[in-house]
């Protein structure tokens, strides 16, 4: 089974809730982005702001985790808001500014309009980029099944 590596674009405040609860929620609770991920895939969160929608600019990678089972489930947060979630094993890390490692990332060099890529809310990256970001975030990757 091939492992895929993903970026999810979410405010830091929402990332922290997901990390504390052991789940991922993307693109305002849509199911489709979660359905692209499977057990054993990796997710790194990029947070453009500290809070949604008008928080202070952050532009940092803020969390990293591995997809547990790949089972997607609805979760009622409010009477009219039932987003989809996916369980994630999060790893200890520290946030790292995007501009601190931008020049080392392949997806940056290969993308003409970087803003469009981030606005998608979820996209795949190479294993090399994953390792670059993970190491910059202080994640101990030795011995991890990648």
From Swiss-Prot:
UniProt xrefs under InterPro entries: EVE_domain, PUA-like_sf, UPF0310
Protein origin, superkingdom: Bacteria
Signal peptide as annotated in the record: none
HAMAP family: UPF0310 (MF_00771)
Protein family per UniProt: Belongs to the UPF0310 family.
Protein name per its UniProtKB record: UPF0310 protein YdcG
Phylogenetic classification of the source organism: Bacteria, Bacillati, Bacillota, Bacilli, Bacillales
